[in-house]
Amino acid sequence: HYQEIYDSDVPVEKLYEYVIKSNKDIFLDIANHYWSVEKKGHYDMAVNISFIMFLYNEKLTAAKLISNISDDIKKDCRLSKEQMMDYNAALTYINAFLDYNDFTKMNAQFIKVADITNKPLKHIAGHFPFSFECPSVMSIYHSSPGALDYETYALEECASNYYRITNGHGKGFEALMKAEVLYNRGEIESAEILCHKALYMADGRNQYSIYIAATFIMTLISIYKGANDEFKEHMNNMTHITENTSYLPQHMHKMTDICKSYIYSNLSSPDNMCEWLKDYKQLELSINFHSLGFANIILGKYLILIGDYHKFLGISGQFLGLNHIYSYVISNIYTYIYLSIANNETGEKEKSHKFIMMAVNLAMPDRLYMPFVHNYPYINMLLDEINTAKDISLFVKNIQRLSKPYEKGVKAINKAGRLLADYGLTVREADVAKLAAKRLTNKEIADQLFIAESTVKSNMKMIFNKLEINSRAELKNFFD
C-alpha cells in the first residue's frame, strides 16, 4: 500500500487540492511510512510529501524528511548526477519554506537553489499558488509591526532570483505587495498603477493567483472611488477567469469566493457572501492552513454584520491563536477591531477601548489605515473616545480623512446595485439609464454602448416603467 504510494508520480498540483484539515492524518501517516518503503531511485512522492508537511505546518516532520531524503539520495547509485541535482534543488527550495514568512531567510535558501542548478526547478515550484489561495500577499508576508517597508523591500530584492529558479512562479508578487501596502495607506492612485503592473506581469506567465489578487485590490479601489462601472468590470473579470480558463484548479475557485465574500462584507452585504465562508468548521476544513488567517477576517466581519457578537467572542481565541503561529499582523489588526466592536455591543466598554488600542498599536507604525476605514461606521465613536493621546491623534485623523470618500463610495456602489436588484433593471438598462441621467441623447448613448438607437428607445421605455417615472430629468434622483 505505502510502497505503491511512494512509487507513484502524482504531481504536487494534483495533491494540493486535498491538502485540507480533514486529510491531515492521512498525509501524516504517509509521511511516517517513508522509512519503511524501498526507494529504488524514485523520490518524487517523498519530495512532494515533505512539502505537504510544510503546508500542514508540520515543520519538524518536514525537516526530518528533507534531511533523510537528502542522505538517501547521496547513497542511491541508481540516480544520475542530474537527477541528484534536481532532487537536491527541490529539497533546498522546500527547506526555504521552513522559514515562512521571513522572506529574507527564505531568499538565502533560494540563492542556494541557484547555486545547485542553473535551470528552473523541476519539482514543487510553480505547482502551487504563490499565496496559497489567499488574495492578500501582504496579509501572509507582513509579520512584524513597524517592519512593513523592509518586508516589502525584501520581497522586491528576491523577486528576480525567485523567478529565475521557478520559471516565473508568482510573477508580479512584488508589485502586488507594494500595491496592497499603498492601498492600505490610502495612496489610492499609486496603488492602482502598481495593480496594473502586477496584472501585466502575471498575465504574461499565466499566474492566475496573482492576476486574481491584483483584480481583487482594484475592486477595493473601485469601491473607494465609487466607480460602479469599474467595480462591475473587476467583479466580472474574476468570474471570467474561473469560468473560462481550461483546467483551472479548484483552489482558484476558492480564491475567487474569498475575494468576492471579502468585498461583499465591506459593502455590508452578508447575503451575497459564500456560504462556506460563514461557518467556522466548514471554513477550517475547506481551506489551506496558510490562508485561514485571511479567511477568518471575512468570517469575523460576517458575524459582526449579522450581530452575532457572542459567537465571534467565542471563536476569537482560535483566530488569535492561528495568527500567533505565523505572526499575521493584518489578521490580528482586524481581529482586534472586531473584538472592540463585539465588546462595545455587549456593554464591555473598557475591553472595547483596550482592543481598539491594540489594533491601533499594531497598525500605526506602518500607517495601515484601511482596516479601520473598512469598519469605520462601527468604530468611529470608539476612535473618538480613545483619541485623547497625542501620539495617536494623527493616525486617527488619517482614518477619518479616508473614511469620508470610502463611505461615499460604498453608498454609490450599493445604490447602483439596488437599481438592478430593487427595481429589476437589467445591466444593459442600468447602463442606458446612467448615461441618460447625464443628459446624453439616444444617439450618443447608442454610440457609447455600441448598440442600435432603437434598442436605446426600447430600453428607455422599460426604465421609465420600472422606475415609475415620466421624464429623463427624474433619473437624477436615482443617479448621482
Mark where each language-model region is.
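Extended alpha-helical scaffolding segments used for macromolecular assembly and cargo binding
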Residues: 1-52
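Alpha-solenoid helical repeat architecture
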Residues: 2-5, 41-46, 79-89, 120-137, ...
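Structural register within alpha-helical repeat arrays
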Residues: 10, 14, 49, 95, ...
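Short coil/turn connectors between adjacent alpha-helices in alpha-solenoid helical repeat scaffolds
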Residues: 14-25, 53-64, 96-111, 138-153, ...
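Alpha-helical repeat scaffolds
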Residues: 26-34, 61-72, 104-118, 148-162, ...
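Internal alpha-solenoid helical repeat scaffolds
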Residues: 32-214
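Linker/hinge segments immediately adjacent to helix-turn-helix/homeobox DNA-binding domains
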Residues: 298-305, 310-332, 338-427, 443
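Recognition helix of helix-turn-helix DNA-binding domains
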Residues: 421, 438-474
